[in-house]
């Protein structure tokens, strides 16, 4: 699916996160010290979108994304903590200027449980040092994204 060979381990980690597989994530992190801080070398573009789509969480990944980005999109605060403990960057920027906190407020939760997970994710990211006032390349802050998506997070 993903074309860049050196991204294979990171893609495997991102898939485990998207599948909410905490045991799988832990096992992958044990095998590679640098995986928590690795950045994706390739990602979705207008020409190549389908192969960079994580169906489980309805989310594209972009060049520069980290596992923390995907954990934020998947509303997995425990995984975010584990990644940051192993060097995962809480404020990494992808090619679109988006940081994990931008991803955490994307999408609309379909249940109270998902809404709670999203709130916890946002809280954990801010607690760990994510800047809620940072803008992406379009000048959008995480707060503005949350408002646009009508999120309570």
Residue ranges of model-derived segments:
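N-terminal capping/linker segments that flank leucine-rich repeat
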Residues: 1-19, 24-27
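Short, intrinsically disordered, charge-balanced linker/junction segments flanking boundaries
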Residues: 125, 133, 138-153
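Ankyrin repeat A-helix N-terminal signature
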Residues: 15-20, 58, 70-76, 103-118, ...
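Short, charge-rich binding segments
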Residues: 60-61, 70-75, 82, 91-94
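Ankyrin-repeat boundary/"N-cap" motif
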Residues: 6-13, 38-67, 93-110, 135-141
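Ankyrin repeat structural motif
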Residues: 22-29, 76-84, 110-127, 151-153
């Amino acid at each position: 699916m993903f074309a860049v060979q050196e991204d294979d381990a990171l893609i495997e980690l991102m898939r485990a996160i998207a599948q909410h597989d905490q045991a799988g994530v832990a096992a992958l992190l044990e095998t590679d010290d640098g995986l928590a801080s690795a950045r994706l070398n390739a990602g979705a573009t207008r020409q190549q979108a389908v192969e960079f789509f994580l169906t489980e969480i309805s989310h594209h990944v972009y060049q520069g994304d980290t596992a923390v980005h995907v954990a934020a999109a998947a509303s997995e605060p425990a995984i975010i903590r584990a990644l940051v403990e192993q060097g995962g960057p809480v404020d990494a920027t992808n090619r679109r200027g988006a940081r994990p906190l931008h991803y955490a407020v994307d999408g609309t939760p379909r249940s109270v449980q998902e809404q709670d997970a999203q709130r916890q994710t946002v809280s954990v990211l801010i607690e760990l040092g994510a800047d809620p006032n940072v803008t992406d390349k379009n000048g959008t802050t995480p707060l503005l994204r949350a408002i646009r998506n009508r999120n309570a997070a």
